[in-house]
């Protein structure tokens, strides 16, 4: 059975859906193929005991009025379909080091003023650092779109600059250094490799305007999927791509699916991990073996262990902040040091509010984890990993809950149900190697090997997703626009988004 479309998109995460919305709005006949029964990828939410939990994206920056993520949401036509709530403007994040808590406010000036009061000897350096963060962050914005550019490429040289060293050059106090390093958890940053461009994009967007997605991030995915369908698009679920068939004319000929379907299109966009995508491509002399070998050997960022808690009603007051709880003052994940110590690394704790906004109805805890800690179950799949795996998960969850209890008194006694997910869970749902949370490691010391262009050697095969540009919601959104610009033109697309 052969089906023909203008655009065929592999994967329905934020990247795939964004490309689907953009191109379907331009009149292209779009088809998205998703291996799971539910669209969304890392936007997926799930419900347990009538409580919603997000799986991959827990809050989104630059979502305030006239900010870049809100502008894209408006352009997609889903702004009125999702409900957002600003995180506490005085404490969008609360950094916990030893017994002290440090609150990070929204707004660059407020950020510098508040931390400058606590670390007066570093206020000038902090001011310079945050100015640089916001300069990089502002390289994407509505003004750039109005000028016909998706981003200001002149600042992308910061990809070759160390995030950790840049912080250290501006800040002397080690505690403040680690407070500022907390954002590394949101893009998979490691002290030895993290680049300043990714750091600034993620941190800057949250300083600008971090927001909760009420009702769960699945509402974003569902709303975007509905726009695609309303524009005449097709979304196929519960069906995986098994082969990308190439022709002798340097292009993709069609896609093969797990149910025997053949999907033909003018253009093909893969939002899957590049290691997965190129494994699917039929051998062709156009894509050289050295390139394929390089892609296969690239290192991926760490995965996350997640604990989801339902709570007794009206027991824990809702705290409109995201807690980052650091062990031994260090906010940077050290894979070698944390081997065999699952649950003891930096921990993020967040709450979902009840309908009246006064109480927490659930809590989510996430922490980075070393791949060697779950390597015993690498060759297993969901619901078939055995009792040892369940015991290990329970042990890790208990460690994390015990640590969270120190900043949220009464948490343990308020728990009614506990659910867990390891990187293997994410691997099986998102098809990401090792369950990596943020895809390929982008090493500032040698960025070229992990610089993945949106255009492949195959004329009509494009890439999108967090491995191409910057991880996280804002990076994936920008990358999708860059991918689609190959088809409809950057200036045209940028100005349309700006005018939405």
Label the predicted regions.
Residues 2-128, 132, 442:
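N-terminal glycine-rich phosphate/pyrophosphate-binding loop and immediately adjacent elements
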Residues 98-193:
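Rossmann-like flavin
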Residues 175-187, 406-470:
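A glycine-rich dinucleotide-binding beta-alpha-beta segment and adjacent secondary-structure elements
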Residues 200-252:
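Helical element adjacent to the flavin cofactor pocket in flavoenzyme catalytic cores
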Residues 242-358:
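Mid-domain catalytic core of redox enzymes
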Residues 246, 489-500:
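Active-site-proximal substrate-binding core of FAD-dependent oxidoreductases
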Residues 314-421:
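C-terminal segments that line or cap access tunnels to active or ligand-binding sites in enzymes
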Residues 466-488:
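A conserved FAD-binding loop/helix module that cradles the flavin
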């Amino acid at each position: 059975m052969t089906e023909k479309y203008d655009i065929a998109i592999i994967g329905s995460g934020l990247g795939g859906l964004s490309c689907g919305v953009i191109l379907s709005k331009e009149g292209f006949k779009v088809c998205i193929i998703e291996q799971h029964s539910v669209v969304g990828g890392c936007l997926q939410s799930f419900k347990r005991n009538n409580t919603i939990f997000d799986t991959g994206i827990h809050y989104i920056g630059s979502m305030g009025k006239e900010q870049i993520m809100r502008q894209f949401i408006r352009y997609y036509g889903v702004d009125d379909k999702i409900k957002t709530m600003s995180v506490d403007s005085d404490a969008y994040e609360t950094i916990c080091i030893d017994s002290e808590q440090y609150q990070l406010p929204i707004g660059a000036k407020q950020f510098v003023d508040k931390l400058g009061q606590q670390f007066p000897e570093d206020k000038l350096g902090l001011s310079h650092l945050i100015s640089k963060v916001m300069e990089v962050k502002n390289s994407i914005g509505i003004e750039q779109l109005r000028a016909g550019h998706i981003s200001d490429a002149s600042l992308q040289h910061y990809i070759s600059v160390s995030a950790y060293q840049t912080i250290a050059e501006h800040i002397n106090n080690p505690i403040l250094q680690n407070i500022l390093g907390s954002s590394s958890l949101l893009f998979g940053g490691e002290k030895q490799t993290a680049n300043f461009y990714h750091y600034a994009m993620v941190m800057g967007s949250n300083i600008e305007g971090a927001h909760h997605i009420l009702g769960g991030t699945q509402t974003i995915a569902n709303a975007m999927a509905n726009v695609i369908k309303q524009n005449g698009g097709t979304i196929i679920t519960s069906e995986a791509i098994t082969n990308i068939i190439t022709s002798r004319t340097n292009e993709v000929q069609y896609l093969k699916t797990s149910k025997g379907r053949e999907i033909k299109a003018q253009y093909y966009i893969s939002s899957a991990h590049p290691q997965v995508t190129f494994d699917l491509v039929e051998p062709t002399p156009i894509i050289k073996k050295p390139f394929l070998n390089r892609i296969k050997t690239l290192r991926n960022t760490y995965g996350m262990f997640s604990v989801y808690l339902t709570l007794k009603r009206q027991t824990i007051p809702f705290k409109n902040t995201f807690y980052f709880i650091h062990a031994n003052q260090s906010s940077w994940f050290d894979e070698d040091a944390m081997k065999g110590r699952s649950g003891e690394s930096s921990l993020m704790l967040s709450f979902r509010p009840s309908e009246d906004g006064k109480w927490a109805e659930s809590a989510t805890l996430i922490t980075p984890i070393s791949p060697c800690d779950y390597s015993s179950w690498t060759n297993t799949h969901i619901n078939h990993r055995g009792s040892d795996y369940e015991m290990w998960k329970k042990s890790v969850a208990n460690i994390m809950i015990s640590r969270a209890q120190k900043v949220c008194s009464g948490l343990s006694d308020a728990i009614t149900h506990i659910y867990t997910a390891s990187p293997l869970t994410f691997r099986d749902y998102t098809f990401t190697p090792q369950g990596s949370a943020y895809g390929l490691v982008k090493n500032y010391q040698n960025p070229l090997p992990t610089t993945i262009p949106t255009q492949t050697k195959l004329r009509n095969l494009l890439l999108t997703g967090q491995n191409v540009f910057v991880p996280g919601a804002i990076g994936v959104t920008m990358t999708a626009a860059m991918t689609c610009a190959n088809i409809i033109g950057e200036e045209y697309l940028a100005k349309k988004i700006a005018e939405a």
